[in-house]
Amino acid sequence: MVPGSCSSFGLLVILSFQNVPDVGGFPNVPLFSLFTNAVNRAQHLHMLAADIYKDYERTYITDDVRRSSKNSQVVSCYSENIPAPTDKDNTHLKSDMDLLRFSLTLIQSWLNPVQALHRLFRNSDVYERLKYLEEGIQSLIRELEDGNLRSYSFMRTPYERLDINMRTDDGLLKVYGLLSCFKKDMHKVETYMKVIKCRHFAESKCVI
């Protein structure tokens, strides 16, 4: 018992990004601008992920679906398999390079799943936005270290065997869980980027 189409997602995504400037891969710009662009990208991706999650919940997660969730397997977020900090105190204990590499790993872990979920992001450029942020983080790593762009190795393929079937309650709940993971991970990336920027550029209004 699946409600109508996902047309509302297209409009939502377009509105979310219509005012975000496209700076591509952050070519030859000062460090402050690299940080500002990366933080803005992460902020908008987190906002987008939260809006899509809420819209999906309103559209698909009915009371009947919620009742059936008691017997459904909960989706495990891939990010639980990497030692990325999950709270403010632990985040501040990590080095800049640790936070950048955690961010890079989280972004890269969503490149394939976002393509599989593309029909939920109709007329959007979520994948391209992830790629832009990936390039921005790589540029920061090059600037702050020796050009080594390694991220943390995937202990397993992120969200392998991803089968999207929205014709069943279990399928609807699986997508719901994935969108929740996407939202949480984009929040982490946004937080990490803000922490690093604040370390380099003491800003009076910078609150983490």
Curated annotation (Swiss-Prot):
Gene3D superfamilies: 1.20.1250.10. Its main location: secreted. Zn(2+) binds at residues 44, 190. Keywords: Disulfide bond, Hormone, Metal-binding, Secreted, Signal, Zinc. GO terms for biological process: animal organ development; growth hormone receptor signaling pathway; positive regulation of growth; positive regulation of receptor signaling pathway via JAK-STAT; response to nutrient levels. Residues 1-25 form the signal peptide. It holds the Pfam family Hormone_1. Growth hormone plays an important role in growth control. Belongs to the somatotropin/prolactin family. This is Somatotropin-B. The gene is gh-b.
